[in-house]
Amino acid sequence: MAQTLAQTKQISQSHTFDVSQSHHKTPNDTNSHSVIYSTQNLDLWYGENHALQNINLDIYENQITAIIGPSGCGKSTYIKTLNRMVELVPTVKTAGKILYRDQDIFDQKYSKEQLRTNVGMVFQQPNPFPKSIYDNITYGPKIHGIKNKKVLDEIVEKSLRGAAIWDELKDRLHTNAYSLSGGQQQRVCIARCLAIEPEVILMDEPTSALDPISTLRVEELVQELKEKYTIIMVTHNMQQAARVSDKTAFFLNGYVNEYDDTDKIFSNPSNKKTEDYISGRFG
């Protein structure tokens, strides 16, 4: 099955980065991980509002990167540039580059559809389709041309197992996804994302609408997923960022104020504003 879906992808997986030549903000212990995203001198405007300013940020493969900062600082805007969803806003304009596996995603020849196959997204509010669980999971693979029932069945099981919810739902696959709890719906949305075999998963506050038990399950799942995927997660929850992430970027007023290993950010930040934010003095 993996080969069948992989054949529908046209973005080359062979590009690599020479990390030693990076001139961007990088954490210290990155020797064992390749750069998958390199944001270079990125500026973004909503009309006249300069929402992102001179963003330089390298994201490392098979790591969890937390994006933190107060409301309106540019966190969600930034991750939506990574799969170009931000372009759904008519007044948006950008300058600078975002390299995904050494290709500029803003290049006119670069396919947004291909990018969004490789870079999945999970939103703040669970947003399953008004369809059965089975149809939710198979939606993406069907768009990519997979019609074989056996292959689709395998994708459903693999994806739900990947989202740690197969045992809960295996006897309810043809139930409407709206009938599930909020935590179950969010894990179905994660499974739907996994079904198209992305390399990167963007998460925009994926647990903010969930109860504590569901939040814990999603956090445990995120830790497991980084073995196969690169995860970039926006969160307002400082404890969550400290628990689950490897790297943390602190955004403030549209800038990257500090970016480092999560342990360093939360134990000995280099910037006073970072310290003030994570200690709750503002935000």
Curated annotation (Swiss-Prot):
Any one GO biological process: phosphate ion transmembrane transport
EC number: 7.3.2.1
Membrane topology value: Peripheral membrane protein
Record has Transport as a keyword: yes
A single Gene Ontology CC term: plasma membrane
Domain ABC transporter span(s) in chain numbering: 37-278
Matching Pfam families: ABC_tran (PF00005)
Stretches with biased composition (Polar residues): 1-20
Name assigned to this protein: Phosphate import ATP-binding protein PstB
Source organism per UniProt: Staphylococcus aureus (strain bovine RF122 / ET3-1)
Phylogenetic placement of the source organism: Bacteria, Bacillati, Bacillota, Bacilli, Bacillales
Name of the encoding gene: pstB
